[in-house]
Amino acid sequence: MKFNFNETEDAPDSRRSPTPKEPVRWVPLQSHPVFASLPSSQDEPAVSQLFPRNFMAWDGDSRVYYWDSRRYLLHRLSLRLGEPEPSSVLAAVPSKVMQPDLQVTFSVSKISINKSGSAVLLAGSDGICVMYLFGRASVIEDNVICRVVSIGSEIYTSSDSAITLLQASWHPDSDTHLGILSSDAVFRLFDLSSDTELPEQEYYLQPGEPGRSRTASSIYPADFSFGGDHLWDRFTVFILFTDGSIYILCPVVPFGSVYKWESVMEIYNDANMYGVKSSNSLAVSNSSLAIEWLEATFPDLTEQGTRGENILVVKAQPYALLDASLALQGPLYKASSGDGDEDFAVREAECKGRAVSLLYNLVSKDSILVTAWSAGQLQVDALVDEIQPVWISGNSSRLRMNSHNKIQGVAMICESNISELPVATSNLPLDHTVWLGHPPPLLRLAMVDLALPKMREGGSLVTLFADSLLPERIYSLHDGGIDSTVLHSLPFTSQASGKDEALKTPSVHTVLSTCQEESAVSPLLGFVPLSDSFGYSWIVAVLSSGECIVAEMKTWDLLLPIHVSTDKTVSSSAIEKKEQENSCIISKELLAGPKIRIAPHALPNQRSTPANSVEGRSILLDYVKLFHENYIEYAHKVHFELQHHAPNLKRIIDDQHQRLAEANEKISKVEKNQSFLEKRIDKAIERHDSLEQCLQRLRSLPGTHKKPLTRAELDFKSELDQYAGVEVDALQSSIETLRARVKKSTQKSHKGTVVAASQKKQYSKKNLIQDTQMSQLQSTLAKLSLMNSDNSKKVKIVESALKSQESSFM
């Protein structure tokens, strides 16, 4: 279902199709002039990058969008995938240029397109807006002027606000809903079809137990990801915090979004079957709340008998529980251990830096969560159990109603429910854990180290993408380039296919290396994966130097890991056997000759027979027949074999000559480079000697004889490094957010006092208060202020006298 919320009246220019002046021609995408016109990377200021940068987006069909950050223009490139060759990508020249009708006042770092391709999200750390690609538009100098709407300007782009955007994404089940996570630890869901300034849903995140926060990074969010099309996952938002902990918000449903009837009915029947009929009162309570929410959000569940069975999709209605709020489930613990502190220690030992990115990926029957760290590690986990909604009773939600008493907005505080639950372990049966409110445990699939170079203090910003054609493949976009990680085995998918194998190590390949050394800004401006219906896949990357890279990604047999044999004896013998088979031109039987003997062995007492006798002639005839039957036929076979193997022999000889020529050429190259190599070896030896001398001088310094740090000192040093690298940023952001809130509250209180004073003045006028009384009050206030200032001066004099006396006594 598509929602059209653009204005129906079209401008006169919008009826004209903005055709370019020059005819359309098709060129390879990497040779498109749009990328060649990019400014040089040397002109870009070396500013710290706080928001993941990606100026490219794909609508899933045949259009790629690119944002020009210098000219504030959006380019739309029409593509032909797989033409004229299956592995080629062509783009139309010239491209369609789209210009915002309003000036974008913030720096755009990321663009994203909704699933219908009707709107593009322009997001940055200081603001966010949406550009509508169709509807009311005009044409100026071949540029299509598109309508731009700011999102939450009072919250994100106001001059008084210190709130920064951390992540923004379209909801996968709605074309008009945006999810935004900000530095004030609030997740907001905006509905562009109703209101772009006020959020439709607000969730104030309160992770951990109140008053027992471990570090500042444990309460500072980093990223979020929507769930996929699987049971309650489709109603789930996964929140990542900078310490690596993952929390769950469920259920979160955009008002008016559409879902499949079968999907909603499946979780509805599950709640009725396993929750309500449980012997545990807590499971009955949780499942009853879930059933109540489902029946109110999707009224078709209760009206199924009256409306018939021909229901394909259902529409979500605005609803929220009045006396309960969503629980912030988590942090998700590892399935091998139920102790949260132990799991946190293990995670800190494996990963370094801070968590920067989160990706939810649904692969067949497995829900995969990939966490990226600033030091370059990827943490790949799978959900062991199904997600179920949890509410905390007593925390009422705040509703915003319209004139028809319908819900327009919901706001609630989401606290962690970990203190109310017993410690959950993975060895409990299903009947003891279902619908009890336990967050689903995580199964560690792999830890991948991308070995990123350390180029800046805060670490690298790693952005994760899933391949639309092969969900087992995950792309990692970072300062050093692009890497591809392929998962070869998944727990539930392998179990469903009948494979009972151990988890295999994922394969990691470098797709693109930017050879970064000391630059503070990544040269990658945009990245997008492409795919078509014939099974071909590509990646497109744009560099700040104006270079566009298009690479075809193999998909067939990619999930089969390469097996490398370590038995050198077998491999060498196989090679020798193959060489012997290739060198065999004539069969060994022909080389051995005929096996039949013509002349039999003569007995010692046998008489000789004369040749001219009858017996001698008969013996000679028999010898001639045997000779013809054996040697003549053998000669024919040899002749046939020689004729048959002549081309093969010629090919082998030519191959040997070619190899000989190549060997001679290599030998000549080596002879030419021998002097150069000798010079390099001499320089290396000299460098080695100088380094040894420097090492000897360093060893003689007094600081080298100091004792090494103890284990406790090393632990304390690592804590200080962690605090300097992660905690300071989180504390600084929290302080700025609190200052903004205090400033906003003081402004509101000042406005309230002004309004109250004006109301009081009007009321006094109505009661005919005389001006003399007002003047008396003013004079009294002036006297009081003078007395207050005099008293403060006297207090300062007394304090100075006391300090002087104390100093004299000491």
UniProtKB/Swiss-Prot annotation:
<dbReference type="InterPro" id="IPR019321">
    <property type="entry name" value="Nucleoporin_Nup88"/>
</dbReference>
<dbReference type="GO" id="GO:0045087">
    <property type="term" value="P:innate immune response"/>
</dbReference>
<dbReference type="GO" id="GO:0051028">
    <property type="term" value="P:mRNA transport"/>
</dbReference>
<dbReference type="GO" id="GO:0000055">
    <property type="term" value="P:ribosomal large subunit export from nucleus"/>
</dbReference>
<comment type="function">
    <text>Involved in the regulation of exportin-mediated nuclear protein export. Required for resistance mediated by multiple R proteins and for the appropriate nuclear accumulation of SNC1 and of the downstream defense signaling components EDS1 and NPR1. Not involved in salt tolerance, ethylene and auxin responses, but required for systemic acquired resistance.</text>
</comment>
<dbReference type="GO" id="GO:0017056">
    <property type="term" value="F:structural constituent of nuclear pore"/>
</dbReference>
<keyword id="KW-0653">Protein transport</keyword>
<dbReference type="GO" id="GO:0000056">
    <property type="term" value="P:ribosomal small subunit export from nucleus"/>
</dbReference>
<dbReference type="GO" id="GO:0005635">
    <property type="term" value="C:nuclear envelope"/>
</dbReference>
<comment type="subunit">
    <text>Part of the nuclear pore complex (NPC). The NPC has an eight-fold symmetrical structure comprising a central transport channel and two rings, the cytoplasmic and nuclear rings, to which eight filaments are attached. The cytoplasmic filaments have loose ends, while the nuclear filaments are joined in a distal ring, forming a nuclear basket. NPCs are highly dynamic in configuration and composition, and can be devided in 3 subcomplexes, the NUP62 subcomplex, the NUP107-160 subcomplex and the NUP93 subcomplex, containing approximately 30 different nucleoporin proteins.</text>
</comment>
<feature type="coiled-coil region">
    <location>
        <begin position="646"/>
        <end position="748"/>
    </location>
</feature>
<keyword id="KW-0811">Translocation</keyword>
<dbReference type="InterPro" id="IPR037700">
    <property type="entry name" value="NUP88/NUP82"/>
</dbReference>
<dbReference type="GO" id="GO:0005643">
    <property type="term" value="C:nuclear pore"/>
</dbReference>
<dbReference type="Pfam" id="PF10168">
    <property type="entry name" value="Nup88"/>
</dbReference>
<dbReference type="GO" id="GO:0009627">
    <property type="term" value="P:systemic acquired resistance"/>
</dbReference>
<dbReference type="GO" id="GO:0006611">
    <property type="term" value="P:protein export from nucleus"/>
</dbReference>
<feature type="region of interest" description="Disordered">
    <location>
        <begin position="1"/>
        <end position="23"/>
    </location>
</feature>
<keyword id="KW-0906">Nuclear pore complex</keyword>
<dbReference type="InterPro" id="IPR036322">
    <property type="entry name" value="WD40_repeat_dom_sf"/>
</dbReference>
<keyword id="KW-0539">Nucleus</keyword>
<keyword id="KW-0509">mRNA transport</keyword>
<keyword id="KW-0813">Transport</keyword>
<keyword id="KW-0175">Coiled coil</keyword>
<protein>
    <recommendedName>
        <fullName>Nuclear pore complex protein NUP88</fullName>
    </recommendedName>
</protein>
